[in-house]
């Protein structure tokens, strides 16, 4: 956004940001999603992006529950959604079992419906279709040692 001088409105809801965001024009709201009046959320339109990096734990009343059952159904067609730490069709990494993540079970159900069109999965393409990285122009991107690509991009229909 800064590099290309793109006019935008970035709202980040993160109760505990882990990294400094100095110099970025971001409206930080440090309130857990469970304490937010959903009527006050920004209205997203076609072409907007909803970037989700949640607790990854889908239990009643969790942020994942609120996102999937209340926020996503409100989105109009053409909104892009990014989920982080999604390894479909595989389970979470073995060394992550202690985290007890289950979000991707819910994401699997979303993908089975008709509201969300999968656009890109960095994990899937790197592990199941790496030949397409060159076709898409992503073969130049280096992955840091020990990191796992895990971005899933969807578009609402």
Stretch-by-stretch model annotation:
Residues 3-54, 59:
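S-adenosyl-L-methionine
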Residues 43, 56-156:
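C-terminal substrate-binding/active-site "lid" region of AdoMet-derived donor-dependent transferases
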């Amino acid at each position: 956004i800064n590099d290309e001088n793109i006019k935008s409105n970035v709202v980040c809801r993160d109760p505990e940001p882990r990294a400094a965001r100095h110099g970025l024009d971001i409206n930080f709201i440090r309130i857990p999603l469970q304490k937010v009046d959903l009527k006050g959320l920004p209205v997203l339109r076609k072409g907007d992006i909803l970037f989700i990096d949640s607790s990854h734990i889908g239990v009643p009343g969790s942020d994942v529950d609120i996102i999937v059952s209340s926020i996503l159904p409100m989105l109009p067609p053409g909104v892009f959604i990014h989920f982080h730490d999604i390894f479909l069709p595989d389970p979470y990494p073995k060394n992550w079992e202690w985290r007890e993540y289950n979000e991707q079970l819910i994401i699997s159900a979303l993908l089975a419906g008709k509201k969300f069109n999968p656009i890109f999965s960095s994990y899937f393409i790197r592990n199941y279709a790496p030949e397409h990285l060159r076709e898409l122009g992503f073969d130049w991107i280096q992955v840091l040692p020990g990191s796992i690509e895990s971005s899933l991009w969807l578009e609402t229909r």
